């Protein structure tokens, strides 16, 4: 099935010094995952939990709190998605020791899942 946007794209709103009051970026506006990895909806659902927690602390400064916590959430699935892309030799990017380890681990996990 072809997808309209089949790439990984991350925006770092947590690094902004200012953000308009009353607005909040959420879901794919923070991070768009390649749909083949099936991570986008899961991350958006957990972002909803984070948003609820941030709203509980009051509306003042919510964007900064939310973006910081959402960024920490996104870090791991982002590393997995980008690392998975780097398994393909034609994809350009640095294949660090961490990326190679994550790819090795996920390959082992998939092989084990096929036998279980």
Place the predicted regions along the sequence by residue.
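C-terminal helical "tail/cap" subdomain of flavin- and related membrane-associated enzymes
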Residues: 50-116
């Amino acid at each position: 099935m072809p997808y309209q946007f089949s790439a990984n794209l991350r925006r770092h709103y947590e690094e902004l010094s200012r953000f308009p009051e009353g607005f909040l970026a959420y879901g794919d506006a923070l991070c768009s995952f390649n749909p083949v990895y099936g991570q986008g909806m899961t991350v958006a659902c957990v972002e909803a939990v984070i948003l609820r927690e941030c709203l509980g602390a009051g509306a003042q400064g919510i964007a900064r709190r939310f973006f910081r916590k959402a960024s920490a959430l996104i870090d791991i699935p982002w590393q997995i998605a980008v690392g998975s892309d780097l398994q393909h030799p034609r994809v350009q990017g640095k294949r660090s020791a961490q990326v190679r380890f994550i790819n090795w681990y996920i390959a082992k996990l998939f092989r084990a899942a096929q036998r279980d």
